[in-house]
């Protein structure tokens, strides 16, 4: 398997046959100078938990775009996001942001998620068919994160466009010049929007997510203005498109396994298990990247210091060495720990909120529209992103 495969039409349509080949080729596959890829569960899990495997974001930018790109506001902004940093700076920033994403805070969002799902369905349930991407799975997480930030819902459309233009930053292949221009403009638009909002919140002392970050302290230190701007943008990115794609991918997986869907409809108490299994089966985030900060030994192999490793989460979730019959969706599967949210110090901070949103979205949809049928199940158009896997449209017949 080669790095170029991650943007090939075959991979975008269905990455799992390529993952099977990757696992068969060995514990690691070389994909370039000082670059490796792995899809085996035990190695992915081991490296995610290894503290000598860290982030090397600006070096990856230098390699892909050259030295001049290091001063671009887009990449400087991303480099302030705690997702891109290593301890101890990562620990400090994550600790501050984490206060808004505890289990208690995430669970408190359940009534809002349920109400949002009902309101969205109210708007389209009388139609004969609907695109669930534009009418349900995309607006649901955006409305919730906007409520958490106390952002005017009328701004959600422009914010979602900007976020979508930023999403290409997470792909392994370099952006084209046009894509780089659009991503830079999107970052500047979001930075300007949230700078204005942050200044308003400083005087209001509210209870929203942005106000919580302004007040958050750990060991007497607060976030700087630029850190708040970058990490609010990160939370918007993480709380929107990844979750919306999860909803769509879960619906596709369930409808491609009608017996499992029927079982879930007959007993919605299985929803928490079903959501986890759908995430294992076809998650939205397909891989993450780590850099060896020192020589790292694992299962008889050595990852040399300075090596970049592509950890294929989607491949690990289908590894038969970890999961029995991994290519089959089984909503009552006795879970081994799935890799959809990563692991270790960079484990997804918002995973609890994502699970709440998924459980509520699917439960309300199945309760309100029990006869819903996906009309384009055999002609799906998958987006052109190597990492954030999802479909461009999901047409459903409602009655």
From Swiss-Prot:
The keyword Heme applies. InterPro entries: Cyt_P450 (IPR001128), Cyt_P450_B (IPR002397), Cyt_P450_CS (IPR017972), Cyt_P450_sf (IPR036396). PROSITE patterns: CYTOCHROME_P450. GO terms for molecular function: heme binding; iron ion binding; monooxygenase activity; oxidoreductase activity, acting on paired donors, with incorporation or reduction of molecular oxygen. Keywords: Heme, Iron, Metal-binding, Monooxygenase, Oxidoreductase. Its cofactor is heme. It is an enzyme of class 1 (oxidoreductase). Its EC number is 1.14.-.-. The keyword Membrane does not apply. Heme binds at residue 348. SUPFAM superfamilies: Cytochrome P450. Belongs to the cytochrome P450 family. This is Putative cytochrome P450 133B2. It comes from Xylella fastidiosa (strain Temecula1 / ATCC 700964). The lineage of its organism: Bacteria, Pseudomonadati, Pseudomonadota, Gammaproteobacteria, Lysobacterales.
């Amino acid at each position: 398997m080669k790095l170029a495969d991650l943007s090939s039409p075959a991979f975008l349509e269905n990455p799992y046959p390529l993952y099977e080949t990757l696992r068969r080729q060995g514990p690691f596959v070389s994909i370039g100078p000082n670059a490796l890829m792995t899809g085996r569960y035990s190695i992915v899990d081991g490296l995610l938990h290894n503290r000598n495997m860290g982030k090397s974001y600006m070096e990856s930018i230098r390699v892909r775009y050259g030295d001049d790109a290091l001063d671009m506001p887009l990449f400087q902004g991303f480099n302030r996001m705690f997702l891109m940093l290593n301890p101890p700076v990562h620990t400090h920033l994550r600790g501050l942001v984490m206060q808004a994403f505890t289990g208690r805070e995430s669970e408190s969002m359940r009534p809002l998620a349920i109400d949002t799902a009902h309101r969205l369905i109210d708007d389209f349930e009388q139609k004969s068919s609907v695109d669930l991407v534009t009418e349900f799975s995309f607006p649901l997480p955006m409305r919730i994160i906007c409520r958490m930030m106390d952002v005017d819902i009328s701004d959600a459309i422009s914010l979602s466009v900007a976020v979508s233009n930023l999403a290409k930053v997470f792909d392994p292949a370099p952006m084209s010049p046009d894509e780089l221009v659009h991503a830079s403009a999107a970052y500047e638009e979001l930075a300007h929007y949230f700078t204005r909002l942050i200044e308003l919140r400083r005087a209001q002392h509210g209870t929203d997510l942005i106000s919580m970050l302004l007040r958050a302290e750990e060991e007497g230190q607060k976030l700087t203005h630029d850190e708040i701007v970058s990490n609010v943008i990160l939370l918007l990115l993480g709380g929107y498109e990844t979750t919306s794609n999860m909803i769509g991918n879960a619906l596709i997986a369930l409808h491609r396994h009608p017996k499992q869907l029927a079982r879930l409809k007959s007993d919605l108490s299985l929803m928490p298990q079903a959501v986890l299994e759908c995430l294992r089966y076809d998650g939205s985030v397909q891989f993450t990247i780590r850099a060896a900060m020192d020589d790292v030994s694992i299962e008889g192999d050595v990852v040399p210091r300075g090596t970049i490793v592509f950890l294929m989460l989607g491949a690990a979730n289908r590894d038969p060495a970890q999961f029995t019959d991994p290519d089959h969706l089984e909503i009552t599967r006795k879970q081994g720990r799935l890799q959809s949210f990563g692991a270790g110090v960079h484990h997804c901070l918002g995973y609890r909120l994502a699970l709440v949103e998924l459980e509520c979205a699917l439960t309300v949809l199945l309760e309100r529209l029990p006869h819903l049928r996906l009309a384009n199940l055999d002609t799906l158009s998958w987006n052109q992103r190597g990492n954030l896997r999802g479909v461009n449209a999901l047409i459903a017949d409602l009655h």
